[in-house]
Amino acid sequence: MTSASSATIQPPRIPRVGFVSLGCPKATVDSERILTCLRAEGYLISPSYADADLVVVNTCGFIDSAVAESLETIGEALTENGKVIVTGCLGAKEDVIRQAHPSVLAVTGPQATEEVMQAIHRHLPKPHDPYLDLVPPQGIKLTPKHYAYLKISEGCNHRCTFCIIPSMRGDLVSRPVGNVLQEAQNLVDAGVRELLIISQDTSAYGVDIKYRTGFWQGRPIRSRITELARALGELGIWIRLHYVYPYPHVDELIPLMAEGKLLPYLDIPFQHGSKRILKLMKRPANSENVLARIRQWRDICPDIALRSTFIVGFPGETEQEFEELLAFLEEAQLDRVGAFAYSPVKGAAANALPDPVPSEIQQERLARLMQWQEEISKKRLAGKKGRILKVLVDTVDENGVIARSYADAPEIDGVVYIEPDFSIKPGDWVDVRITRTGIHDLWAKKI
């Protein structure tokens, strides 16, 4: 028999939270903020449903397929665990979630870290003795150690007729420039070698606060994308810009790319090539001006890689207007293109437009566009054969090395394949010579 004085006292079980993150990089950043708060308060993060005391699902609600995936994931978490808190863009439509899954514990909208934490506290009280030293200065990240997403603002002031993001994430709210730059510095100090700058509307940064001057390391910096980009360019790592709306002042960023302060890469959603369709979308409608600007950008920075997204089968789109889009692609010679068929997402103003395009025609046009663009992308990549490029290594194993060049954003663009070499590590910058090219990817040898 063991005496009371010698009995082993079992420490209390540390509460564990499971986490599922769906959607775009902006949602990933929201997830990282919640995870950072959880670790700061002493919670453990469970990799499985079975070991978790409850599960948080960060949802996406941008298009119908994303809604379906989110609802399916919530259902899976309820089946496997039973205690689920829902957040994210689909959370802005609580009635949709409650109708499908009435037993969820709580529902919040996007960028709702405090509300999520309050819901977790209600259903899973936090530990009494959190360990703040478990949280590094850069916070908890879901990306590999060598790259990270840096969100500079929330929301959007535009009212594009195909989009419901403003109804879910609200109007533009820019972060203080000093906070953005300090987070960037913390990430660099932690070993990050590439920052992917994201928001709903990156080029609008600072509009809501009238480009107010902030401070970083004792010097004044305006809350404006050009000034922010210039300061980020001083960190000595790759800076990649995403979700750049084609405002005129975007032209100011191209010289920074030519100078090497920013990666010569621009993710800029043009959406279509027809003036009438662009007007129906409530997007900038002067495609001739866009093409002239692209030529000017390439004159200033010949290596610039341009990525864009397009919608086919928008309500009222005629065959002639679709062919105008193909002609725009031919003239623009974009490096990377993503496209999808218009989907009548509930709440989008475009749903009220006349003459919806039948699904079979949408899919036929989408296939034609992607085939058309594949030839353009293939030709542009072929021009890189024999060139020496600096690449950032993502993975290394017995099958070889997978890296990315300045023209390749993670997960959405192509990659550079290098022969097996275990002297190379993830996060290394390596100079390579391009030996073969494809439609999306490159093959290379280390030099």
UniProtKB/Swiss-Prot annotation:
Known EC number: 2.8.4.4
Query: GO CC annotations?
Result: cytosol
Keyword field: 4Fe-4S, Cytoplasm, Iron, Iron-sulfur, Metal-binding, S-adenosyl-L-methionine, Transferase
Q: Which SMART domains match?
A: Elp3
UniProt-listed InterPro entries: Elp3/MiaA/NifB-like_rSAM (IPR006638), Methylthiotransferase (IPR005839), Methylthiotransferase_CS (IPR020612), Methylthiotransferase_N (IPR013848), Methylthiotransferase_N_sf (IPR038135), NA-bd_OB-fold (IPR012340), Ribosomal_uS12_MeSTrfase_RimO (IPR005840), rSAM (IPR007197)
Q: Report the family membership.
A: Belongs to the methylthiotransferase family. RimO subfamily.
**Record's protein name:** Ribosomal protein uS12 methylthiotransferase RimO
Native organism is Nitrosomonas europaea (strain ATCC 19718 / CIP 103999 / KCTC 2705 / NBRC 14298)
